[in-house]
Amino acid sequence: MSTQNGMYYSLLEWFKTLNLNAPHANAEELADGVALAQALNQFAPESFTNSWLSKIKSSAVGGNWRLRMSNLKKVVEGVYEYYSDVLNYTLQHDFVKPDVQAIAEKCDLSELERLLQLVLGCAVNCAKKQSYICEIMCLEEELQANIMRALQELESSTRQTTEGGVVSSLSRNSLSGMLDGNAKALEERDAMAQKCFETEKKMLLLIDEKTNLQQELHKLQLEFARLEHNTIGDDGVSLGPIQAGSVRYNELRRQLELVKEELLQSEGAREDLKIKAQQQETDLLHMQQRIDELMKSTAELTALKDEVDVLRESTDKLKVCEAQLETYKKKLEEYNDLKKHVKMLEERSADYVQQNAQFEEDAKRYANTKGQVELFKKEIQDLHAQLDNESSKNVKLEFDNKNLESKTLALQREKDNLLKERDNLREAFDELKCGQLSTNSGSLTGTTMSRELQPPAMMDKMQRLEAENKALREGQGGQTALAQLLDDANKRCEHLREQLKTANERILSLSHASQSDDPILKENEFSKQIKQLMELNEQKTLQIEESATQNSTMQCKITQLESTLATREQELMAYEVKYRKCIERAKEVIKNIDPRIASVMEANNLEKSVDVIEEESKTKMSGMEEQLMASAFYRLGVNAQRDAVDSKLALLMGSGQTFLARQRQSAPRKPLTTMKSK
């Protein structure tokens, strides 16, 4: 096993311990991605579902590297989604993403090592992590060290968003302690095995010695029997009979004693060896019992260490749960406040809905009055036209009145002048009758009489004109003076033309008055007409003043309504801000209720539903605001128009009309009662 690929082979040995249907003994069998997908489905079936597993093509085992690459892409994407969505881990840039093309084409061991490292991270963070950790602990020490190093590299290259690390269940302290305890137990086991081996060797040696001693004893017995029955020595000399006191007997007796001593020594050695063998057997039994006890103690120690780790995790979880419980209590209080606030908002929204319904009913009712309003508009337009005609007539009558007054004054003056001229003519006629004059004098008197018959104003004008003509003839040298004189002359000509027009009008009026029989009645009629015109003028001025006051009141009402609308809009904005805050708090409460059990998909669904509710509430509130503003503006316009129509009708029903005209006019209606806004 090379040092460069030691981690890969360690991960492969761990992967071989998994119970999978697909072959997974070497890199070529892992390069198709089927075994990896089955392992992920075994680790987290809720994330790597059967439908996802069905997308992995098992036919990619052949030589089609493109199908294998597509399978590996699906596996890598699924692993990255599992890390980001379920475990809330983000892999940093120092951890290079496995190159699926290199794995599919060349079975690159380094890339496959990174992929197996990611799969190992999924295994130690799934729901069944305790069983997989126990399987890792049952491997060899070197494999465990390499797997631990792979997990540490994965932890250093990941950045977690929630509490805990990548290898939450295998903390460094607990795992190092477990490894130390396991190493000590293995050393004790090796020492006991060495002792057992040595005792077995000693037993074999003692058994061999025992067999050798038995063989020697058998030989000695045979030799003793031979020597006992043999009468000839080794050198061929006859030993003689064996009798007491004989040399042979003594020699045999001496040999027998020597043999007995040797036998006693061998028996003592045998007994010692037996005792030693029994002691060694008892020691071996004790050692085996001690080994069994140590094995049990190691198993119990591992179980106790697992329990200690579980208890530590449970204590950590308990502390976290206590902190979360305190936060949940605070959030529950806030949630109750939010519930109360939401109830108030719902009540207000219900009130707004009722107001909107009432406004809609009012709008339906007012739709029936649209025709009448249009008729009133037409009548108002006709009345305005009549008012314009009457105002023009009033102006004409005022002008005629002034003309008549000037005419009456001129007529009185002319009447006085005519009376004076009549008296003068009578005197002149009397003088002509009395005196006798010559024709020249008569002609002169005729010319003088014709001049006297002319009015004095005309004479003054003629004289003034003659003087101006003389001045003009004399001052022809200066053009500026001539221009000024021409302008003055033109102005005077225009003034004279106007005077001629007025004179002609007076002549026509005098002729009409002379034709009439009773001028006093006509003067009375003229005075009555003038009085009526003055009254109409006063009424029109009153109407204008009242319309001005109504306009000012309407402007005040409009400003008040605009201010109320602004305040309502500010209130609605404040309510929207509070509503958003409430929704955000509710989101946080929902997220923090059980973040370990609640999946990310449920949180996303909740956020989407909350966003949909916010959009619906915004659209409803905006629609209600538009409807309320439209109905309020429509009602304001209708009331203002009705007040204007009623005021004009009331003015038209004044003293300037007859009884029948008053009966023909429609009575003003009562103003509509506006609804009070809550």
From Swiss-Prot:
CDD domains according to UniProt: HkD_Hook
Domain of life: Eukaryota
A molecular function (GO) term: microtubule binding
Main localization of the protein described in the UniProt heading: cytoplasm
Keywords tagged on the record: Coiled coil, Cytoplasm, Cytoskeleton, Developmental protein, Endocytosis, Endosome, Microtubule, Synapse
One GO CC term on file: synapse
Residue ranges annotated for the Calponin-homology (CH) domain, each copy included: 5-123
Compartments (UniProt record): Cytoplasm, Cytoskeleton; Endosome; Synapse
Chain coiled-coil ranges: 135-435, 479-589
GO terms classed as biological process: cytoplasmic microtubule organization; cytoskeleton-dependent intracellular transport; endocytosis
Annotated spans, Interaction with microtubules: 1-155
Task performed by this protein: Involved in endocytic trafficking by stabilizing organelles of the endocytic pathway. Probably acts as a cytoskeletal linker protein required to tether endosome vesicles to the cytoskeleton. Involved in modulation of endocytosis at stages required for down-regulation of membrane proteins that control synapse size. Not involved in synaptic vesicle recycling. Required in R7 cells for boss endocytosis into multivesicular bodies (MVBs). Has a role in regulating adult longevity.
Domain notes: The coiled coil domain mediates homodimerization.
Assembly behavior: Homodimer. Interacts with microtubules via its N-terminus.
Family: Belongs to the hook family.
Name recorded for this polypeptide: Protein hook
Source organism: Drosophila virilis
Phylogenetic classification of the source organism: Eukaryota, Metazoa, Ecdysozoa, Arthropoda, Hexapoda
